[in-house]
């Protein structure tokens, strides 16, 4: 069966079902994951938040004239990847964030890229990842050069961008849309035309031996018996609440976004 996306619409009259893309934002504490997520969803920069809050948001996007139902998981690991299966088994693509003014966060992003590489090896699938050097507005306090970011991305074969959650929305939006494009490419490659979430599907648990060898925090990988299907994270980990976006202020269209509780938006 042909892929449901990436094809021109037949007949012009029929609307294709929106492509469903799950995106997980990974990175060390303070790298700016929440700020980037909220910037993308609301065009606003937040400066206060609850660092322990992990939530999944959804947004109806249009990428390359195609409707996309995008879910964004703003993860809240502590200092290292933990209980990674909640996003490894869920996301179609990953944004790995570090802060250009923090060498520590850059090293943290390298751990996340390694984790993704190991997961890809374990599952024999590839997972698009984009490396983001955030807080570009703080470039005068740089601890990580652009060349270092590009080199790390090159090592893992992923796209690289420097961004700022404080600066222009369009650049942040571009990066998220690039992640959607990457996910779409991968999904098309795998000819995934089946529904993405089948709750009856049983996960076969096995311990990933690679994590210990690579000094990563303990992670258990779930390999689905049908490897092309992914499970939604447990309800406790993914709270979807629809609210109106500030973008809806344009009266023409009111895209729905999901919850921003826990964030103070100015
Ligand atoms: N100057 C500047 N500050 C930023 C930027 N992005 C985030 N911050 C600030 O950096 C701090 C951490 O940002 P968060 O978005 O909460 O970082 P996080 O990665 O989600 O951190 P955890 O929630 O602890 O995992 C906050 O004080 C933000 O206001 C940015 O692009 N520029």
From Swiss-Prot:
Its EC number is 3.6.5.2. It comes from Bos taurus. Pfam families: Ras. Keywords: GTP-binding, Hydrolase, Nucleotide-binding. Belongs to the small GTPase superfamily. Ras family. This is Ras-like protein family member 12. Transmembrane segments: none annotated. GO terms for cellular component: plasma membrane. It is an enzyme of class 3 (hydrolase). It catalyses: GTP + H2O = GDP + phosphate + H(+). One of its GO terms (molecular function) is GDP binding. InterPro entries: P-loop_NTPase, Ras-related_GTPase, Small_GTP-bd, Small_GTPase. GTP binds at residues 27-34, 74-78, 134-137.
């Amino acid at each position: 069966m042909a892929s449901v996306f990436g094809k021109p619409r037949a007949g012009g009259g029929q609307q294709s079902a929106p492509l469903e893309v799950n995106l997980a934002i990974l990175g060390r504490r303070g790298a700016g994951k929440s700020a980037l997520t909220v910037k993308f969803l609301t065009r606003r920069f937040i400066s206060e938040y609850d660092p322990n809050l992990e939530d999944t948001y959804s947004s109806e996007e249009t990428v390359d004239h195609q409707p996309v139902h995008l879910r964004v998981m703003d993860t809240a690991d502590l200092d290292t990847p933990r209980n990674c299966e909640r996003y490894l088994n869920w996301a179609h693509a990953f944004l790995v964030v570090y802060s250009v003014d923090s060498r520590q966060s850059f090293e943290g992003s390298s751990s996340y890229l390694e984790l993704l590489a190991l997961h890809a090896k374990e599952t024999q699938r590839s997972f698009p990842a984009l490396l983001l050097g955030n807080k570009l507005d703080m470039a005068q306090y740089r601890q990580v050069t652009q060349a270092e970011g590009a080199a790390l991305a090159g090592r893992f074969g992923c796209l690289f961008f420097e961004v700022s959650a404080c600066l222009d929305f369009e650049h942040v939006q571009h990066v998220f849309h690039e992640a959607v494009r990457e996910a779409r490419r991968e999904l098309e490659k795998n000819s995934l035309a089946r529904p993405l979430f089948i709750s009856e599907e049983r996960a076969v648990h096995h311990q990933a031996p690679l994590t210990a060898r690579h000094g990563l925090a303990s992670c258990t990988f779930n390999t689905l018996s049908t490897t092309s299907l992914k499970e939604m994270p447990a309800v406790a980990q993914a709270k979807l609440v629809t609210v109106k976006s500030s973008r809806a202020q344009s009266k023409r269209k009111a895209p729905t976004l999901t919850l921003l509780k826990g964030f103070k938006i100015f």
